[in-house]
């Protein structure tokens, strides 16, 4: 059985990156929530 976690930085950024989050209304909501909570890192 192959490992379920196969690290890939390009996919990581594409799926969970800042620009991806900013591209949708709900993504911006996530960022706003993380800012309000005081997260040091907002996205991947």
From Swiss-Prot:
HAMAP family cross-referenced by the UniProt entry: Ribosomal_bL34
GO CC annotation: ribonucleoprotein complex; ribosome
Gene3D superfamilies: 1.10.287.3980
Composition skew (Basic residues), residue ranges: 9-44
The protein's name: Large ribosomal subunit protein bL34
UniProt GO BP: translation
Region (Disordered): 1-44
Pfam families: Ribosomal_L34 (PF00468)
Family according to the record: Belongs to the bacterial ribosomal protein bL34 family.
UniProt xrefs under NCBIfam families: rpmH_bact
GO MF annotations in UniProt: structural constituent of ribosome
InterPro entries: Ribosomal_bL34
Alphabetical UniProt keywords: Ribonucleoprotein, Ribosomal protein
Lineage top rank: taxon: Bacteria
């Amino acid at each position: 059985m192959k490992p379920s976690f196969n690290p890939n930085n390009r996919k990581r950024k594409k799926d969970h990156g800042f620009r991806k989050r900013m591209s949708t209304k709900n993504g911006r909501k996530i960022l706003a929530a993380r800012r309000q909570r005081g997260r040091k890192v907002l996205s991947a």
